[in-house]
Amino acid sequence: MHTQSFFSAAEEVMKRTIDRLKCELSSIRTGRVNSAAIETIKVESYGSIMPINQIASISVSDARTIEIRPWDVSQLSAIEKAILKADIGMSPANDGKLIRVSVPHLTQERRKEIAKSIGKMAEEFRVAIRNERRVLVENIKKLEKDKVITEDDKKKLEVEAQKVTDGYIKKIDDSIVVKEKEVMQV
């Protein structure tokens, strides 16, 4: 049946959307030091743009410090500039061999700003999921119009499409609640 391939394709897109959300959420800074916040910062290196984690090793040295050890020390200044340019509220210190990034405590005001931006991000991902549902429903309607399925089948499939969509929206909401709690935790 054609509908199964439509559902499979839609679910695959929805799964990738959830994966992207989780990736973006992991890069958001919480009260705890996490190297993921800087791993994906783009650095101009060797004539191309690369994430920091592809040109250096990144480790958390203590509760408030991340160390970046480039594999080529000539990249130190490029990495330092990229961190400053990213404007993520962290200050890099270059000692000639590695970069130490001091992670300041988040103020309550900054925590609220981050939580608000997480909410906006969540809505963008919900819209992406709903758009995929819309495409799925349009395909179902086209099958009915082409007399491949009956009107009853169409209605059942539309209900199923809504259930799938609701499941993925719930995954977004659950992920957001967890991340907002992490951010607001002092």
UniProtKB/Swiss-Prot annotation:
Coiled-coil ranges per the record?
none
**A Gene Ontology MF term for this entry?**
ribosomal large subunit binding
What keywords would UniProt list here?
Cytoplasm, Protein biosynthesis
Q: Do you know which CDD domains this protein is assigned to?
A: RRF
- Which SUPFAM superfamilies did the record assign? Ribosome recycling factor, RRF
Q: Does the keyword Protein biosynthesis apply?
A: yes
Q: Which GO terms describe its biological process?
A: translational termination
One matching Pfam family: RRF
Entry keyword annotation includes Cytoplasm: yes
Localization: Cytoplasm
Task: State the GO CC annotations.
Answer: cytoplasm
- Per the similarity annotation, which family is this? Belongs to the RRF family.
Its annotated function is as follows: Responsible for the release of ribosomes from messenger RNA at the termination of protein biosynthesis. May increase the efficiency of translation by recycling ribosomes from one round of translation to another.
What protein am I looking at? Ribosome-recycling factor
